[in-house]
Amino acid sequence: MASGPHSTATAAAAASSAAPSAGGSSSGTTTTTTTTTGGILIGDRLYSEVSLTIDHSLIPEERLSPTPSMQDGLDLPSETDLRILGCELIQAAGILLRLPQVAMATGQVLFHRFFYSKSFVKHSFEIVAMACINLASKIEEAPRRIRDVINVFHHLRQLRGKRTPSPLILDQNYINTKNQVIKAERRVLKELGFCVHVKHPHKIIVMYLQVLECERNQTLVQTAWNYMNDSLRTNVFVRFQPETIACACIYLAARALQIPLPTRPHWFLLFGTTEEEIQEICIETLRLYTRKKPNYELLEKEVEKRKVALQEAKLKAKGLNPDGTPALSTLGGFSPASKPSSPREVKAEEKSPISINVKTVKKEPEDRQQASKSPYNGVRKDSKRSRNSRSASRSRSRTRSRSRSHTPRRHYNNRRSRSGTYSSRSRSRSRSHSESPRRHHNHGSPHLKAKHTRDDLKSSNRHGHKRKKSRSRSQSKSRDHSDAAKKHRHERGHHRDRRERSRSFERSHKSKHHGGSRSGHGRHRR
């Protein structure tokens, strides 16, 4: 009894018609019949006879396209070239191994069947070809050793590369190849369900020619055999029945040799074959002679490219990089990798506008406290503008005062100016905001301007350093404003400077008698 998925068993009753019987099914099931007379007992049932068939070993139409190789990204012309090249290797190796033609044909049919279940991208066609011819030699009762098969394929590889033939060294590479062939043979058996029987049309061709009374024409017989051997490179042996293939080979040979055959009715109708099937087989066979010879190197590169692409797709599906490292997810979560738009380095020479804004924000509460003491809103706006340029004016006034003063008491004056002028400036401005109302300037009074100049000359001898700092402050204030408001603010600064100088003169005169109180007050205000 058969144990393959493509085998069926049929049983017939031997004696009485009352015995139950069942016909064989096409799905590989075994039918049983019990009889009262003698027969074959299988298990607990008695059978009259058991027949094994493989009528359903053909590939269905839905499996012909797309093939597993096409699903892995290999195009149909490349797959067809690989099938042709694999069958040519099996045929050439069978000749060198002195195998019968039936064994070589069996190996090629097994090769086609296997690659309709597996992909050329995932399995090396050369290793599978070795396994198929080794398995076919055992099936056709002409076994060959694996070492001979490997040596023959090594010799064919050297001839294909136009290299000097050299024997294969028995090293680790040879051992690995031998193990791969053994594993591939086991894989072929598993994929085919151990149903490796192949019905060849060789004998069928001779039988049909005898019916047609053409068996004595050796040229016709040999030509039909040649067409059949060439059709082994195509997929017709896994699509059509061997009887149909035999009729197609006879049809091609008779047309090539211009031998007439019966047409009323057509001779192939006698053997249960249609004209459409014969024409399709003839087209597939004749197409071989119009194709270019397959390029082994280009096919290997194409398969290797698809193999790398398939491996990268698998790693990407697992979330890994091509080198095997885990890929960082950019869809969600925290990523330690910096964004390409974020600045990596901040130059120290460039001044960031954010830092300037932060500095002004920090100084803003002090300005608000000083401006809150004034009952007028207009003074507050001017004080804000003057505070923004105060830091720059301080640095400029210090450098200018150091360069202009040549007295031996320069360091003492600088210290006094740092401690005293800050406190005096803050007190004078706060008092001016709180005590004096907002005054309108008289632009047409030359007597006041002359009086101001005389007071400046008198106070310059006593407080030269303070006058220099006040002038630097007025200059820094005037530089920050536009040209339209420069004249107006300069005149307002004269009145304010006059009041500040008078009060600072009084405080400095008192500080001669009370020096410690002024410095302490300056530290407190700072």
Swiss-Prot record:
Function: Involved in pre-mRNA splicing. Functions in association with cyclin-dependent kinases (CDKs). Inhibited by the CDK-specific inhibitor CDKN1A/p21. May play a role in the regulation of RNA polymerase II (pol II). May be a candidate proto-oncogene in head and neck squamous cell carcinomas (HNSCC).
Localization terms from the record: Nucleus speckle; Nucleus, Nucleoplasm
Main location: nucleus
Name under which the protein is recorded: Cyclin-L1
Positions carrying Phosphoserine: S335, S338, S352, S355, S374, S445
Domain remarks: Contains a RS region (arginine-serine dipeptide repeat) within the C-terminal domain which is the hallmark of the SR family of splicing factors. This region probably plays a role in protein-protein interactions.
Homology family: Belongs to the cyclin family. Cyclin L subfamily.
UniProt region (RS), positions on chain: 390-432
GO cellular component, one term: nuclear speck
Superkingdom assignment: Eukaryota
Region (Cyclin-like 2): 203-287
Primary gene name: CCNL1
Organism: Homo sapiens (Human)
Biased composition (Basic and acidic residues): 342-352, 361-370, 499-508
InterPro entries: Cyclin-like_dom, Cyclin-like_sf, Cyclin/Ssn8, Cyclin_C-dom, Cyclin_N
Assembly information from the UniProt record: (Microbial infection) Interacts with human herpes virus 1 (HHV-1) transcriptional regulator ICP22.
Keywords from the named record: Cyclin, Host-virus interaction, Isopeptide bond, Nucleus, Phosphoprotein, Proto-oncogene, Repeat, Transcription, Transcription regulation, Ubl conjugation
One Gene Ontology MF term: cyclin-dependent protein serine/threonine kinase regulator activity
